[in-house]
């Protein structure tokens, strides 16, 4: 006779089923529809006079965060573990298209080219996801990106306003936001 599932296993399975349906739908509608193979701003894909329809970095980070959480939750569940592990390279490459090197530091920028804005809060959340991916996989490439973000955050860490990390790189206003300081 089969061993009945414990309640937490039933809940986890139900959660994963629903999360998988949502992520699969989102990816089918809003991921990989352009040459950059990343998250798109709208469904259906729409371009405008200033941008090609790919989402800006905070939306890329949100998609990455959802993926990382689902990937972690799927470990040990054969129906989902391989599916989400197999997407790791694609998600990693997608977000890394937004890395720029300005002011002698590499970090994730709003758009994927040098000379545009970079925000400390967007970077800290991506850095946390990279650290989580490292914890899940033990692959150094994720740890390297988390360290890159940490090095960038330390440039924005000032003693003004009682200390903390600035919200935006340039212009470096003296304001600090919880979204950039608290997670760091």
Give the location of each predicted region.
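Residue-level recognition of alpha-helix boundary/capping or hinge positions
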Residues: 1-3, 184
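Low-complexity, Ser/Thr/Pro/Gly-enriched N-terminal "stalk/linker" regions
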Residues: 3-113, 140-164
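Well-ordered alpha-helical segments within folded domains of soluble proteins
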Residues: 52-72, 118-134, 176-184
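The feature captures the catalytic groove of carbohydrate-active enzymes
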Residues: 103, 118, 131-135, 153-184
């Amino acid at each position: 006779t089969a061993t009945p599932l414990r309640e937490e296993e039933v809940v986890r399975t139900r959660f994963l089923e629903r999360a998988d349906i949502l992520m699969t739908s989102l990816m089918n509608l809003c991921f990989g529809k352009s040459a950059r193979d990343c998250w798109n701003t709208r469904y259906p894909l729409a371009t405008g006079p200033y941008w090609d329809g790919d989402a800006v970095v905070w939306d890329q980070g949100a998609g990455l965060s959802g993926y990382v959480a689902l990937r972690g939750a799927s470990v040990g569940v054969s129906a989902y573990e391989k599916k989400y592990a197999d997407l790791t390279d694609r998600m990693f490459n997608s977000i890394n298209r937004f890395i720029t090197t300005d002011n002698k530091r590499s970090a994730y920028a709003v758009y994927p080219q040098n000379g545009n804005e970079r925000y400390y809060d967007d970077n800290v959340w991506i850095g946390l996801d990279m650290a989580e991916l490292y914890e899940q996989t033990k692959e150094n490439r994720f740890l390297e990106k988390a360290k890159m973000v940490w090095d960038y955050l330390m440039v924005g860490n000032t003693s003004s306003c009682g200390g903390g990390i600035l919200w935006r790189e340039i212009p470096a206003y003296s304001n600090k936001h919880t979204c950039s300081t608290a997670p760091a």
